[in-house]
Curated annotation (Swiss-Prot):
Keyword terms, alphabetized: Chloroplast, Plastid, Ribonucleoprotein, Ribosomal protein, RNA-binding, rRNA-binding
Source species, domain of life: Eukaryota
Main subcellular location: plastid
Ribonucleoprotein as UniProt keyword: yes
Subunit structure, interactors included: Part of the 30S ribosomal subunit.
InterPro entries hit by this protein: Ribosomal_uS8, Ribosomal_uS8_CS, Ribosomal_uS8_sf
Protein role: One of the primary rRNA binding proteins, it binds directly to 16S rRNA central domain where it helps coordinate assembly of the platform of the 30S subunit.
Record has Ribosomal protein as a keyword: yes
Gene3D superfamilies in alphabetical order: 3.30.1370.30, 3.30.1490.10
Stated name of the protein: Small ribosomal subunit protein uS8c
GO MF annotation terms: rRNA binding; structural constituent of ribosome
Species the sequence originates in: Sorghum bicolor
Length: 136
């Protein structure tokens, strides 16, 4: 039985966000590096650095905690992450069937033949792939 590094990454970010932690440390693989780069580009993460500890590499990410102000006061927005395609049930979509998360407000991350990219990039390039996760 193998490890699901994508699920570990999403769970670490979700747990740190719920506990209001500033940083998250996850094991660095090619897939996790590409997903974290997308999260950084889309504004869900403030910064990322690579850290080496006894011949193993880790990604240390600083989370972005957004605060919204309403008439009733200030509240903190949460980042929702959901794993879609998993090792036991792979989910694929062609470019016409790529789902829009919250009507375009969120993003879907896909693994395509041209690398890991967001749903918008995959639609522009007219390629489909495996739907890895939703983030909103």
């Amino acid at each position: 039985m193998g490890k699901d590094t994508i699920a570990d990454l999403l769970t670490s970010i979700r747990n740190a966000d719920m506990n209001k932690k500033g940083t998250v440390r996850v094991v660095s693989t090619n897939i996790t590096e590409n997903i974290v780069k997308i999260l950084l580009r889309e504004g869900f993460i403030e910064s990322v650095r690579k850290h080496q500890e006894s011949n193993r590499y880790f990604l240390v990410s600083t989370l972005r905690h957004q605060r919204r102000k309403t008439r009733k006061g200030i509240y903190r927005t949460r980042t929702f992450l959901k794993r879609i395609s998993r090792p036991g049930l792979r989910i694929y979509a062609n470019y016409q069937g790529i789902p829009k998360v919250l009507g375009g407000m969120g993003i879907a991350i896909l693994s395509t033949s041209r690398g890991i990219m967001t749903d918008r990039e995959a639609r522009l390039n007219r390629i489909g792939g495996e739907v890895l996760c939703y983030i909103w």
